[in-house]
Regions:
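Cleavable N-terminal export/targeting peptides
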Residues: 1-33
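Beta-barrel outer-membrane channel/assembly domains of diderm bacteria
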Residues: 24-138, 161-167, 238-253, 258-262, ...
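Aromatic/pi-system hotspot detector in well-structured domains
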Residues: 44-48, 120, 175, 202, ...
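C-terminal outer-membrane beta-barrel translocator/porin domains of Gram-negative envelope proteins
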Residues: 83, 89-91, 106-107, 263-274, ...
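Surface-exposed coil loops of outer-membrane beta-barrel proteins
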Residues: 93-118, 126-228, 233-237, 300-334, ...
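Solvent-exposed loop/turn segments connecting transmembrane beta-strands
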Residues: 154-155, 196-198, 225-231, 261-269, ...
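Long, internal scaffold/assembly segments composed of regular secondary structure
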Residues: 210, 221-295
Length: 406
């Protein structure tokens, strides 16, 4: 359940109290190029339509998200950042927002509401250290374990403390303590478990970067105090590498392995592994990827990443936001790149099956077309077509989106 804003306030007060102490006692480092203070303004209008054969009714939502705030660089190295956001329904409301009670319609998880988005105090006055306290986005690596779910109108944030250390050029270490997850369904959702999770989580992520790529090792220890049986620890390693064959051609690969086990009061069955292999080739701005991702499962428990930016994995139709107990194998092929007049395309094909038992979980085709224009504007057309076999029901989704970012 959501905690009060007391954590954010305590962290901000503590940071403001420590600021003059740090400025007085620390030797003055060479000042890095400072970002500018200024307003934050974003607006995104979206039409989303869902045809899910599990429902007699199709869903349609026309929503507008406005995010407004300010970044204040109040002394070299110190930043205060705060944004609030409002989400409004511009259409008929014929969809299940998760908060409006329209359960006869498919879910489009953009409930109307107004809330604080981010509110944090940051320090980066030393090129080797960075700290941040308060409500903030958390995006680790490719967002497979922790992300901001930026696709939804209300992004996911965390009440957290972050410390980053770069002891030498190729090395970086980041630690985060997470106190609360503020979910995409809104802080005032009538279901408190959709609004937020109280956490006692420790995240450690270390990287070694070279011209040819990067190696990352991580340990994520998450005690979900609202759903204690789901608590897990995940230990893993991720490799990304690339090699230029010529000025036009580049080959690359991403590979990852993680082991998940129960943590704190987590259930004994929370035991599974994760594997990813994703080779790719790039030519003059166009990229082709062929991937194989396995979220292990044994019929009782499937490898879980509940705080990930899940929409960008396993198909845009969002049929696998929760990993089945039998796990999931996703073999996919995709291409993306520029076309005429500034437009960019994306095409993806997925074939899904159970990790335990091998049942066919269907196929999915995803396509997108988008472009930016007039410096601050972008438009996006997007489509997902999931064809079911032994899991879920056939589902088609369409999005039309216009966005402004100052």
């Amino acid at each position: 359940m959501p905690r009060s804003t007391g954590f954010i306030q305590r962290m901000l007060y503590l940071g403001l109290w420590l600021a003059p102490c740090a400025l007085a006692q620390a030797p003055a480092p060479a000042p890095p190029p400072a970002p500018q203070s200024g307003p934050v303004l974003e607006a995104r209008a979206r039409h989303e339509a869902v045809d899910d054969d599990a429902f007699a009714n199709d869903a349609e939502a026309d929503t507008l998200r406005v995010r407004l705030g300010y970044r204040w660089i109040f002394t070299p190295g110190w930043t205060l950042y705060a944004t609030a956001e409002g989400i409004g329904n511009l259409g008929s409301g014929r969809y299940n927002s998760t908060a409006n009670g329209n359960t006869a319609y498919p879910v489009i998880a953009d409930p109307p509401g107004t809330e604080w988005d981010e509110a944090w105090l940051g320090w980066n006055g030393n090129p080797k250290f960075e700290a941040k306290l308060g409500r903030q986005k958390v995006i680790l690596d490719n967002a497979r374990f922790f992300g901001n779910v930026g696709w939804r109108q209300n992004q996911q944030t965390f009440d957290a403390a972050m410390l980053a250390w770069k002891p030498a050029a190729p090395w970086a270490l980041r630690y985060l303590y997470l106190d609360q997850a503020n979910r995409v369904f809104g802080n005032y959702n009538p279901n408190p478990l959709l609004a937020a999770y109280e956490l006692d989580a420790h995240l450690v992520n270390g990287s070694w970067t070279q011209p040819w790529g990067q190696v990352v090792a991580y340990g994520y220890f998450v005690d979900n105090q609202d759903l204690p049986l789901t608590s897990t620890r995940s230990l893993g390693v991720r490799l990304t590498a690339k090699h230029a064959l010529s000025p036009a051609w580049t080959l690359g690969v991403a590979a990852e392995y993680a082991d998940q086990a129960p943590y704190a009061d987590g259930a004994d069955i929370n035991d599974a592994s994760y594997v990813l292999v994703e080779p790719w080739a790039a030519w003059r701005g166009h990229t082709i990827k062929a991937g194989y991702e396995v979220l292990g499962g044994d019929g009782r428990y499937g490898f879980a990443t509940p705080f990930a930016t899940l929409h960008i994995f396993n198909g845009w139709a969002d049929k696998f936001l929760t990993t089945p107990a039998t796990g999931l194998r996703d073999a996919y092929l995709g291409a993306s790149g520029p076309i005429a007049a500034g437009w960019n395309y994306g095409l993806w094909w997925h074939d899904f099956e159970a990790d335990d038992g091998g049942a066919s979980y269907g196929q999915e085709l995803d396509a997108s077309l988008g472009r930016g224009f007039a410096k601050h504007w972008s438009v996006l057309f997007k489509y997902a077509d999931y064809q079911a076999d032994d899991f879920a029901r056939d589902t088609q989704k369409v999005w039309i989106q216009l966005e402004y970012v100052l």
